[in-house]
Amino acid sequence: MEGFTIWLTGPSGAGKTTLAVKLAKKLREMGYKVEILDGDTIRKTLYPNLGFSKEAREMHNRIVIYMAKLLTRNGVIAIVSLISPYKRIREYARKEIGRFMEVYVYAPLEVRIKRDPKGLYAKAIRGEIRGLTGYDGVYEEPENPEVKVDSSRMTPDEEAELVIRKAKELGYLP
């Protein structure tokens, strides 16, 4: 089987990691080789002091793109869970990787604030951090993702099934 990349984009707390884990489980149960490339995990493991400037985010995204490209080229389904706030970098990922599907993981701001798994929204509301993507920082919503899921209205299972159906429609899965 040829590999491909499922690129999960969306603001913090939208449900990207939850969907990535659910998708990986379902795809592995179907017999596929799958790797999750989680933006937070990669950042903490490889370069914890990188920072969050636009340049640092772009460098981080380019590294993840390269990793996904290598996995895809070697017959693995790469599931990328990464905010990737800039349209231009997501377009670059699509061009570089080739076999690629963009999944916009959406949840309304009030839902993300309630979830707040990393405590980032609480810090932003208190004024302790600035530029939080999807709060007071830039997030350029995808215009034509292959799939859009609203994690406030769908279960992770429903989201994963929708993504798998689309991957089949695109010919990435039989």
Curated annotation (Swiss-Prot):
* Enzyme active site: 84 (phosphoserine intermediate)
GO terms for biological process, alphabetical? hydrogen sulfide biosynthetic process; sulfate assimilation via adenylyl sulfate reduction; sulfate assimilation, phosphoadenylyl sulfate reduction by phosphoadenylyl-sulfate reductase (thioredoxin)
Kindly tell me the pathway this chain contributes to: Sulfur metabolism; hydrogen sulfide biosynthesis; sulfite from sulfate: step 2/3
Q: Which reaction does it catalyse?
A: adenosine 5'-phosphosulfate + ATP = 3'-phosphoadenylyl sulfate + ADP + H(+)
* CDD domains documented for this protein: APSK
Q: Which UniProt keywords apply?
A: ATP-binding, Kinase, Nucleotide-binding, Phosphoprotein, Transferase
InterPro entries linked: APS_kinase, P-loop_NTPase, Sulf_AdTrans/APS_kinase
The job of this chain, per UniProt, is described as:
Catalyzes the synthesis of activated sulfate.
Record family assignment:
Belongs to the APS kinase family.
> What protein is this chain from?
Probable adenylyl-sulfate kinase
Organism listed in the record? Pyrococcus abyssi (strain GE5 / Orsay)
What gene is this protein translated from?
cysC
